Structures are given as structure tokens and as C-alpha cells.
């Protein structure tokens, strides 16, 4: 099967997801697991709280991605 280039939308989605994971990692590292909330994560990256759920189902899914 031939590899295909990612569309601009797919690249943007991957970049946003990576940004969320990096921000979550920073929050956990600096403030601890209990300090990580969906709201705090959204504020850190400058997006609406509900938009985070487009990338992760819940806090556990974020932590799994961070690990």
C-alpha cells in the first residue's frame, strides 16, 4: 500500500494533539497529576474546554498519551 501525504487538516489535528500532550506533560511535571484538568489544559493551549474532547475522551486518555 502506498503512503500518502497528510492533508493540511490531518497535519493540523496531529499538531494540536501534540500541543495538548506537551501541555499536559508540563502541567503534570510542574504541578502534579491532581492539578491536571481538562479546563486547565484547554486554557494552557488557548482552546475551548469542550474542544479538548475532540482529541481525548477524558483525563485518563490524556495521561495515557503523556506516558
Where on the chain are the PLM-derived regions?
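Basic, helix-initiating cap at the start of DNA-binding domains
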Residues: 1-31, 35-40, 44, 61-64
Amino acid at each position: 500500500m502506498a503512503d500518502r501525504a497528510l492533508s493540511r487538516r490531518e497535519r493540523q489535528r496531529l499538531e494540536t494533539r501534540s500541543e495538548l500532550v506537551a501541555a499536559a506533560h508540563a502541567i503534570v511535571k510542574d504541578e502534579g497529576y491532581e492539578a491536571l484538568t481538562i479546563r486547565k489544559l484547554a486554557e494552557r493551549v488557548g482552546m475551548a474546554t469542550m474542544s479538548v474532547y475532540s482529541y481525548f475522551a477524558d483525563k485518563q486518555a490524556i495521561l495515557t498519551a503523556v506516558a
